[in-house]
């Protein structure tokens, strides 16, 4: 019989130690002769607060109620489980009880609860620790209830794979960081959080050659909340007995308590590889996968043949599957608010560390044009670095990691980070080998939009503003809600003197991204060109608050205020009423030609077809360029004026600037007429 099996048959000190760590109901604490009231406390809570948390009321409340003080009888597993030396039976109503063992309870001071780090839930401002009160003896409650920071996890090896239930309140550690003495990777450059220096007991245990004793020392460190030291000792135990699944399962619990769920999954899979029938590892894997939002993988390990699944986890799995199904249906029809609602419900159900669910929420925000929320949401997802070797989980028919990257790429593109978007979507293609149509579509779209933007930038830089506007327009045909492309095209219109169009595109960009500073700057400048000083002042005042140290914004605001003040004192000159005015006398014609700025005269006849055809376009130009004076002269009604101006053919257009004629055109095209107006306007 192997070394790690023999302890289940020997009534030794090891067995007694294991039994002393079996967390049963609190009302059976009468048969433990060496019982002492101990409170290891939370590794994240000051010692001074431990007494309050150790009361019976506290032990039966939310965060510490994940099984240790439920008052419910334990359910014995039907699975014929092997007793692996040193696997702590833990804090679960469904933990198997060794035949013949004495049921014991712990007083409130000896309370133990699952500790697996702080669940990360996106609440609209990124991932954040979520605390809740939950009177149920099993965790997984919603994060919507009020926090109870006084009741904290105490850091025991977790039961039946139940690594952590949602709603565990935590506080930031104030312990110093020290370099780890071990050789394994403990994250963050081997800098670990401890209570100070590595304890002498830990150093001594690390030098032992008995893997069981090393493991026991690791368990002690775990219960004290010293997860880094516990990991170092479990590593030592594994190096002495590599094929012991209990050691790897315990290490998985410590990793999960440190918030390193993916590595915990890897360790559990190693435990299952060592012993495919090891129930505890399967249960722990199921619980981890539930937190990661991977329903299929969770079901695979929760419903192992011959194993009675934990009913709480089974219910959580079924609820998660329901929310994912409803989310998928809502996404198909574009009901993005329902998508957000179902994702929030899935997270509250326990999938509190799922990158793909947070990415789905980010996608919904993006489709609702809430780009800031989408960016905050997607940036809360940690760097993808999956370790497990299970068949990759899929969401909406896409491998989860690839889906996350696709959403990140689309958010990057919406914010103008085109190069980053291409890198991410290409990486998604390497992950999803099934060539999902959705991933392929995102890849093609991102590349084509980026190409249009690059082409537009090149044309703009060379001064070919009209062609650049067309290039940006091509990109907008592929991505109609890209605020960057709208803002870039607005710059083209501004350079062409088409300020009304510039304002329109800036408005589009700001509808999509209300905090887009560059679009607001461009719109304010366009308002100034149009003489809409009141609107310009309003935009510059917003910019002044957003950019308090920007001297150019301050100067522009002052100029706009001065112009607004002067405008109220200016006389209402002929031609500034945004409509084409009629001129019928020679005197009025001379007055109009002497107006400041540009004056355009349209010599027409109501009986001439060409004149009538171009008249609506002249009205459009009048609205588009409000600083230009537009006039019309009916040659049939004003024969003297037509003769004085030598009008031979109609329609004829004459452009005056500062009282002098600068151009005359006969039967011009729409493009030639507008180009001529903008040329002299600039």
Curated annotation (Swiss-Prot):
Pfam families hit by this protein: Thioredoxin (PF00085), TPR_1 (PF00515), TPR_16 (PF13432), TPR_6 (PF13174)
Cited PROSITE patterns: TPR, TPR_REGION
Disulphide bonds in the chain: none
Region (Disordered): 1-120, 132-157
Keyword Repeat on entry: yes
GO cellular component: cytosol
Disruption phenotype: No visible phenotype under normal growth conditions, but mutant seedlings display increased tolerance to salt stress at moderate NaCl concentrations (120 mM).
Compositional bias annotation for Basic and acidic residues: 16-39
Tissue specificity remark: Widely expressed.
Induction or repression: By salt treatment in cotyledons.
TPR repeats: 211-244, 246-278, 280-312, 402-435, 449-482, 483-516, 518-550
GO annotation, biological process: response to osmotic stress
CDD domains: TRX_family
Compositionally biased intervals (Low complexity): 48-71
Positions bearing Phosphoserine: 8, 42
Residue ranges of every copy of the Thioredoxin domain listed in the record: 587-674
InterPro entries referenced in this protein's UniProt entry, alphabetically: Thioredoxin-like_sf, Thioredoxin_domain, TPR-like_helical_dom_sf, TPR_rpt, TTL1-4
Alphabetized SMART domains for the sequence: TPR (SM00028)
Function: Involved in osmotic and salt stress tolerance. May play a role in the control of meristematic cell size during osmotic stress.
Official protein name in the record: TPR repeat-containing thioredoxin TTL4
Organism: Arabidopsis thaliana
Gene: TTL4
């Amino acid at each position: 019989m192997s070394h790690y099996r023999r302890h289940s048959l020997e009534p030794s000190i090891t067995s007694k130690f294991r039994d002393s760590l079996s967390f049963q109901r609190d009302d059976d604490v009468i048969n433990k002769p060496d019982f002492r009231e101990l409170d290891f406390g939370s590794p994240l809570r000051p010692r001074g607060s431990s007494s309050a948390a150790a009361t019976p009321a506290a032990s039966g409340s939310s965060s510490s109620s994940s099984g240790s003080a439920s008052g419910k009888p334990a359910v014995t597993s039907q699975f014929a489980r092997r007793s692996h030396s040193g696997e702590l039976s833990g804090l679960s109503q469904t933990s198997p009880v060794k035949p013949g063992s004495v049921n014991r309870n712990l007083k409130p001071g000896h309370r133990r609860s699952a500790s697996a780090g702080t669940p990360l839930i996106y609440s609209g401002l990124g991932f954040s620790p979520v605390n809740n009160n939950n009177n149920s003896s099993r965790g997984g409650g919603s994060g919507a209830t009020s926090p109870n920071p006084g009741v904290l996890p105490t850091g025991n090896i977790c039961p039946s794979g139940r690594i952590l239930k949602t709603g565990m309140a935590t506080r930031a550690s104030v312990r110093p960081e020290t370099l780890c003495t071990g050789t394994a990777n403990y994250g963050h450059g081997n800098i670990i959080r401890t209570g100070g220096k590595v304890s002498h007991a830990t150093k001594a245990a690390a030098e032992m050659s008995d893997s069981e004793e090393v493991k026991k020392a690791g368990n002690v460190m775990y219960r004290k909340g010293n997860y880094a030291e516990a990991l170092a000792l479990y590593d030592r135990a594994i190096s002495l007995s590599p094929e012991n699944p209990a050691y790897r399962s315990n290490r998985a619990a410590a990793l999960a308590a440190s918030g390193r769920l993916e590595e915990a999954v890897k360790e559990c899979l190693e435990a299952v590889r060592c012993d495919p029938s090891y129930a505890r590892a399967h249960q722990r894997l199921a619980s981890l996968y539930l937190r990661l939002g991977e329903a299929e993988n969770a079901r695979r390990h929760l419903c192992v043949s011959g194993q009675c699944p934990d009913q709480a986890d089974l219910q959580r799995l079924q609820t998660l599957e329901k929310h994912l199904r409803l989310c998928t249906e809502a996404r198909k029809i574009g009901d993005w608010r329902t998508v957000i609602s179902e994702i929030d419900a899935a997270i509250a159900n326990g999938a509190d560390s799922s990158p793909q669910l947070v990415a789905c929420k980010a996608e919904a925000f993006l489709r609702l044009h809430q780009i800031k929320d989408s960016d905050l949401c997607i940036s809360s997802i940690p760097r993808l670095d999956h370790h497990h070797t299970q068949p990759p989980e899929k969401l909406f028919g896409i491998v989860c990691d690839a889906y996350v990257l696709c959403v990140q790429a689309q958010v990057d593109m919406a914010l103008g980070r085109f190069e980053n978007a291409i890198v991410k979507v290409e990486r998604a293609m390497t992950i999803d080998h099934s060539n999902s149509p959705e991933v392929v579509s995102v890849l093609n779209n991102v590349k084509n939009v980026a190409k249009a933007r690059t082409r537009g930038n090149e044309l703009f830089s060379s001064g070919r503003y009209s062609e650049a506007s067309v290039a940006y327009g091509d990109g907008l045909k592929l991505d109609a809600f890209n605020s960057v492309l709208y803002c870039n095209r607005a710059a083209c219109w501004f350079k062409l003197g088409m300020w009304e169009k510039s304002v329109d595109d800036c408005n589009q960009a700001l509808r999509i991204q209300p905090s887009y500073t560059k679009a607001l700057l461009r719109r304010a400048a366009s308002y100034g060109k149009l003489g809409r000083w009141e609107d310009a002042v309003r935009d510059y005042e917003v910019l002044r608050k957003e950019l308090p140290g920007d001297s150019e914004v301050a100067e522009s605001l002052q100029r706009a205020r001065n112009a607004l003040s002067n405008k109220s004192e200016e006389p209402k000159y002929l031609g500034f009423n945004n409509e084409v005015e009629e001129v019928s006398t020679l005197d009025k014609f001379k007055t109009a030609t002497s107006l400041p700025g540009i004056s355009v005269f349209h010599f027409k006849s109501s009986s001439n077809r060409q004149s009538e055809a171009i008249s609506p376009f002249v009205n459009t130009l009048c609205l588009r360029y409000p600083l230009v004076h537009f006039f019309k002269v009916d040659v049939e009604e004003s024969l003297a004026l037509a003769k004085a101006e030598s009008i031979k053919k109609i329609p004829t257009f004459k452009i005056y600037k500062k009282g002098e004629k600068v151009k005359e055109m006969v039967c011009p095209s729409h493009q030639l007429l507008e180009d001529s107006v903008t040329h002299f306007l600039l």
